[in-house]
Structure formats: structure tokens, C-alpha cells
Amino acid sequence: MIGRIAGILLEKNPPHLLVDCNGVGYEIDVPMSTFYNLPQTGERVVLLTQQIVREDAHLLYGFLTPQERTTFRELLKITGIGARMALAVLSGMSVQELAQAVTMQDAARLTRLPGIGKKTAERLLLELKGKLGADLGALAGAASASDHATDILNALLALGYSEKEGLAAIKNVPAGTGVSEGIKLALKALSKA
């Protein structure tokens, strides 16, 4: 299983890439969210990958963030969703937008994606509910409360608090608060709980 590729980006043709790793060129398909954030050709790139082995092909899919790869893997577990469809979902909306759509059970938002009809959207909502990680949907909502929600959450997790406790505490942090002040406010909220 190939889990990570680091090398020189040789070609970029949406959604395909060619990455040279010590003289071996790997063809990798990426969602557009990853494609738009890639360096220029000739520069070094590091991608997290998902290898899919079929009877007729060995395919690599690449992602810049662990959240994208995890979401891709969750999408593949859904009946009727293959790698191409999962890539289309991640190309059409961010992981946070998908998590919000699942949390709000917003099928209309998903049907705007190419290849996703009403029944597929409903199946996605049903099967992804609670599987994208509590932090994705809740953190998307908490991000409006604090610009540094991820950093604050990571600090709270490092201090031994659960993800659920951390997310609840972040909701008490006002927008525009710095990381250190946000951690103090979150800890204060946790001490009262």
C-alpha cells in the first residue's frame, strides 16, 4: 500500500498529476481542492495517497490534507460510490462543506454536485452521518466562533481533554481571539463544566 508520495511535480493536467520519485513517475489523480493548492511544475510536492487495486489497474489518488484522504476513504465505503464519484464530491465541495451538509442533512446541497442525484445524496447523508469525525462538522461551526479553533482544539487534546469537551469549550471563545487567549478561555469554560 502506498500511503505517501514525495517528489518533483512533473505534470499537472486536471485531475491528473505526474510525480517523479527518484526516477519513477507516479500518475496520481487528485480532487480539484488539492489541485488548486499544488506548487508549480518542477517543484517538490508531498501527497498523502490512497492506492486502489483493481483487476485491470493499480490507481493512486492524492490529497494534501489527512481530512481529505479520510473523507475519501469514508466515501468509498458507501454502496454505489466509487473512486471517481468520491473524487467528484471532494472536487465539488470542501471537507468542511460536506461535513456541514451531512450535519444539516442537506440533500439539495449534494445534488448540485455532478453525478449525484437525489437518491445518491440521501444515501450519502444516511451513511456518512457520524462518520466524518465529530471535529469536522463541529469545528466548521466553531471556526466562526474563533479564527484559531483548530489550534485551540489541538492544544486541549494535548492537555488530555476529549474531542467532545474541546469542541464544547471552543464555542465559548469569541471570534478574533488569539490562540493563547482562546486556550485560556476554553480552559476556563472547561473548569466550570
Curated annotation (Swiss-Prot):
Stretches for region Domain II: 65-139
InterPro entries found in the cross-reference section: DNA_helicase_Holl-junc_RuvA_I, Hlx-hairpin-Hlx_DNA-bd_motif, NA-bd_OB-fold, RuvA, RuvA_2-like, RuvA_C, RuvA_C_sf
Cited Pfam families: HHH_5, RuvA_C, RuvA_N
Stretches the record annotates as Domain I: 1-64
GO molecular-function term, one example from the UniProt record: four-way junction DNA binding
Renumbered residue ranges of the record's region Flexible linker: 139-143
GO cellular component: cytoplasm; Holliday junction helicase complex; Holliday junction resolvase complex
Transmembrane segment boundaries: none
UniProt KW keywords: Cytoplasm, DNA damage, DNA recombination, DNA repair, DNA-binding
Chain residue ranges for the region called Domain III: 144-193
Listed Gene3D superfamilies: 5' to 3' exonuclease, C-terminal subdomain (1.10.150.20), DNA helicase RuvA subunit, C-terminal domain (1.10.8.10), Nucleic acid-binding proteins (2.40.50.140)
Annotated compartments: Cytoplasm
Source species, domain of life: Bacteria
Gene Ontology terms: biological process: DNA recombination; DNA repair
Quaternary context: Homotetramer. Forms an RuvA(8)-RuvB(12)-Holliday junction (HJ) complex. HJ DNA is sandwiched between 2 RuvA tetramers; dsDNA enters through RuvA and exits via RuvB. An RuvB hexamer assembles on each DNA strand where it exits the tetramer. Each RuvB hexamer is contacted by two RuvA subunits (via domain III) on 2 adjacent RuvB subunits; this complex drives branch migration. In the full resolvosome a probable DNA-RuvA(4)-RuvB(12)-RuvC(2) complex forms which resolves the HJ.
Function: The RuvA-RuvB-RuvC complex processes Holliday junction (HJ) DNA during genetic recombination and DNA repair, while the RuvA-RuvB complex plays an important role in the rescue of blocked DNA replication forks via replication fork reversal (RFR). RuvA specifically binds to HJ cruciform DNA, conferring on it an open structure. The RuvB hexamer acts as an ATP-dependent pump, pulling dsDNA into and through the RuvAB complex. HJ branch migration allows RuvC to scan DNA until it finds its consensus sequence, where it cleaves and resolves the cruciform DNA.
Family the UniProt entry places it in: Belongs to the RuvA family.
Annotated protein name in UniProt: Holliday junction branch migration complex subunit RuvA
